[in-house]
């Protein structure tokens, strides 16, 4: 009975004893490949553990903090926090596609978030393999849940704890240093980068090396108003100046900032169109069904030899060609006018600051801007988000003509001026699609 109630811990314990590789999987929504086995050269047997059925979210400390269990999603957290006028760490993109709370913590997600920085907490409940090779449950939630693994997991899942069991010891439930770090524009180090030791703590940044059962996180006050500024230029130095001015002079930092090169814009428009339309029109509830349909279609296509590989992707790409242009006219006009695009979201007092700044700077600098209406805001943010999947779709459709796909995630120093890389001609000519 205990093993049935604590099935996940028991499965992990058995896998450790049998020397089986465990791949933790939550929403599996990564547009560039999620938590799935890759290749056929693993040295040991592999098991994939999906956690989505354990999706409870506990609101604590009057909505200022939450406890997210292993399969809880940002989408559901956003809904639960609305009555408290609070928001989760990530509200763009990740919530749209149903990503998990814990997946973000394990990968320090939040690359475009300026005010909030990377996902981070020092409070979590997780299992690790100790120095003796045994599975060990570690409770760093700062909540009194009992002593034995069975008791801790049962009390947490059943919310069997009192307000007095919740300790407030000063441990962090978010990255409180990032706004200060990102404003230091003359430093010769990046503001954020992979495997930053500052952000590696327990579950945070663990990236699959731990089995995480729950995390305790801070929430954020919902702004009264948001506005998206769509900015374009043909001169990379203009964006360099804007970035420095905003980070060093604005009283209110942007909520987020997302860059697109014209090539990226075009690739996303063509190769991520179906993903865009599915998320926009059917929402997250249909995504699991869509993924399952794609999987079944590909299995069937493999049995029928006259169908090509990755048939579902090829079919969706073909059908998307019949759908009319899904992007707003003003975005399309900027695509024709400008090579470099920037989606900047401001909130509350920052809106007036940004409007005054942009109306002045483009009087004597190359480029222009417009303030998105609600329709354009959603389209611009979603277009940037789905662009991550475009290179994968392109590679699938053209795999016979090209070599492997290579992804580079580059963290520039904060004082870097020459941020836009111009490749040597002999290299540039060998590349079929550069996706920035």
Where in this protein do the model-derived segments appear?
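FAD-binding subdomain of flavoenzyme oxidoreductases
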Residues: 58, 75, 82-240
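Glycine-/small-residue-rich beta-strand-loop submotif within the FAD-binding core of flavoenzymes
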Residues: 35-73, 112-116, 134, 217-221
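Single conserved hydrophobic/aromatic residue that forms the stacking wall/gate
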Residues: 1-7, 11, 434-435
């Amino acid at each position: 009975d205990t093993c049935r109630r604590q099935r996940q811990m028991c499965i992990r314990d058995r896998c450790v004893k049998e020397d089986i590789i465990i791949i933790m999987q939550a929403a599996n929504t990564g547009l560039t490949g999620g938590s799935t086995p890759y290749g056929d050269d693993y040295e040991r047997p592999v098991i994939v553990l999906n956690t989505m059925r354990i999706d409870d979210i506990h609101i604590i400390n009057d909505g200022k903090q939450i406890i997210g269990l292993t399969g809880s999603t940002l989408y559901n957290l956003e809904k639960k926090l609305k009555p408290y006028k609070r928001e989760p760490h990530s509200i763009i993109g990740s919530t749209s596609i149903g990503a998990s709370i814990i997946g973000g913590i394990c990968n320090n997600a939040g690359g475009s978030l300026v005010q909030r920085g990377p996902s981070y907490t020092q409070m979590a409940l997780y299992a690790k393999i100790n120095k003796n090779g045994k599975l060990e449950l570690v409770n760093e939630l700062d909540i009194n849940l009992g002593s034995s693994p069975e008791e801790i997991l049962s009390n947490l899942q059943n919310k069997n704890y009192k307000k007095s069991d919740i300790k407030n010891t000063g441990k962090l439930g978010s990255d409180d240093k990032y706004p200060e770090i990102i404003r230091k524009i003359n430093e010769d180090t990046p503001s954020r980068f992979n495997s930053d030791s500052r952000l590696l703590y327990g579950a945070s940044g663990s990236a699959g090396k731990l089995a995480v059962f729950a995390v305790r996180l801070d929430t954020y006050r919902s702004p009264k108003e948001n506005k998206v500024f769509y900015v374009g230029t043909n001169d990379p130095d203009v964006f360099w100046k804007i970035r420095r001015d905003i980070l060093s002079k604005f009283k209110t930092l942007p909520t987020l900032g997302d860059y697109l090169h014209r090539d990226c814009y075009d690739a996303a428009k063509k190769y991520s169109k179906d993903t865009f339309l599915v998320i926009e029109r059917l929402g997250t509830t249909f995504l699991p069904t869509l993924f399952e349909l794609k999987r079944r279609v590909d299995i069937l296509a493999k049995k029928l030899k006259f169908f090509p590989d990755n048939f579902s992707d090829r079919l969706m790409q073909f059908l998307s060609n019949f759908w009319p242009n899904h992007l707003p006219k003003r975005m399309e006009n900027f695509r024709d006018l400008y090579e470099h695009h920037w989606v900047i979201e401001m909130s509350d007092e920052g809106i007036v600051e940004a409007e005054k700044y942009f109306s002045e700077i483009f009087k004597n600098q190359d480029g222009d801007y417009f303030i998105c209406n609600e329709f354009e805001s959603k389209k611009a943010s979603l277009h940037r988000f789905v662009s991550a999947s475009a290179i994968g779709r392109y590679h699938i459709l053209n795999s016979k003509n090209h070599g492997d796909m290579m992804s580079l995630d580059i963290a520039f120093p904060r004082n870097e001026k020459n941020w836009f890389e111009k490749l040597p001609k002999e290299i540039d000519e060998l590349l079929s699609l550069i996706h920035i």
